[in-house]
Amino acid sequence: MTDQLIIFDTTLRDGEQSPGASMTRDEKMRIAKQLERLKVDVIEAGFPASSNGDFEAVKAIADIIKESTVCGLSRANDRDISRAAEALKGAARGRIHTFIATSPLHMEKKLRMSPDEVHEQAKLAVRFARNLVSDVEFSPEDGYRSDPDFLCRVLETVINEGATTINVPDTVGYAIPELYGNFIKMLRERVPNSDKAIWSVHCHNDLGMAVANSLAGVKIGGARQVECTINGLGERAGNCSLEEVVMAVKTRRDYFGLDLNIDTTHIVAASRMVSQTTGFVVQPNKAVVGANAFAHASGIHQDGVLKARDTYEIMRAEDVGWAANKIVLGKLSGRNAFKQRLQELGVTMASEADINAAFLRFKELADRKSEIFDEDILALVSAEEHSNVDEQFAFVSLSQHSETGERPQAKVVFTVQGKEVTGESDGNGPVDASLKAIESHVKSGAEMVLYSVNAISGSTESQGEVTVRLQNAGRVVNGVGADPDIVVASAKAYLSALNKLQSQAEKVAAQG
């Protein structure tokens, strides 16, 4: 008889706290639908009280997600909790996740509250939340660095008040696997009513041990929920990686003895979607989802894999969604083949009209490059979905002129709220000239803090995927653009970032 391990994904909340990872409502909705296809148990959709934008995103996700539980974060006060409950009204299954810091450092320096005041506020918050929804999660922020006696007292109280999940975060990534696992075990043994709640772990990766700590919390501590993000996305060094913890539990079922609801064949599609949406490129040697995760360069290894895959592979690439063949389509491919490939990649589009529009973009791309890879398809689908969103700025065309020894000239045509405009400029290279051409009309005043180019596939005619990170008035956003022409991709990425600067609202800080 095995136990069930609940996977709680917080890509849309804690993951979004990475500088530049801010997502629009429509982007969050697309990722939420992918998480539902992945069969994630709980989707933490955002922090409704932090901004009107986050409230609307959580509300929209609650309305469209039918299989997964949709969770909203709140601080331990009536206003935040009420706001979360309001956003979750349309959810088939809704959860309020409320938190307050319990470590001496946080209580004294941040909250300026006594332990008794924190205890009382936690009690009242869970009581209030439990009157609004049946599923309430409580987190003692910086729980791992809290006094065990005080923490046990708080956790016993909130369980008595109706908390159904107790999440113990290692907020600053300070824990060591064995110590963290024993810490969870100690809490479960010392809290008299611990059996009345599901115990959860939430680990940050500051020392590179978020996955190891989470697994120790499960194996040693007896936790039955893991909080994680796609690609390990998160502020500072990131969070526990969903794909790594899931595949560890699945691959080593002999050791963990746990069941999962996750459909692992959608992992790679989810990873690519999050990467392309946020602009956070997945490193090639990233476990499970990196481009080299199933690559073998050593002749000895290659020989072994050809003879028997299990000589050097502990899991199958196709089990996590990697395609067996990379080159799948070309300019002679028809709409049905394109649609079939979308289904194989785990991509679901809203309507036949959207598929038709994406297919037209595919045919345009196929006229420009002979081999179309899965990565190309995902990039153009992502671009098509973005083009359907009401945006202030949209790319139309670009022309440039450059000769050796002279400053390049660029002219960029784009729309501003549907009206076509033209910007022209010279620059210290074609990319610089093109972005200055856009700025000559927009005059955003934003500072570029990152510019990076990633080849989507491995040939010289590959599409370039450009990430641009802009900072303005304390806000940081990423824009992503893809095109076989790097200069065009750069202009698209810059306009994408400008759109996010226009739409992003200020937010209240959440827990780490």
From Swiss-Prot:
Compartments, as annotated in UniProt: Cytoplasm
Name assigned to this protein: 2-isopropylmalate synthase
Annotated disulfide bonds: none
Pathway field: Amino-acid biosynthesis; L-leucine biosynthesis; L-leucine from 3-methyl-2-oxobutanoate: step 1/4
GO molecular function term, any single one: 2-isopropylmalate synthase activity
Native organism: Variovorax paradoxus (strain S110)
Keywords on record: Amino-acid biosynthesis, Branched-chain amino acid biosynthesis, Cytoplasm, Leucine biosynthesis, Manganese, Metal-binding, Transferase
Statement: the UniProt record of this protein carries the keyword Cell inner membrane: no
Top-level taxonomic group: Bacteria
Binding residue positions for Mn(2+): D14, H202, H204, N239
Residue span of region Regulatory domain: 394-512
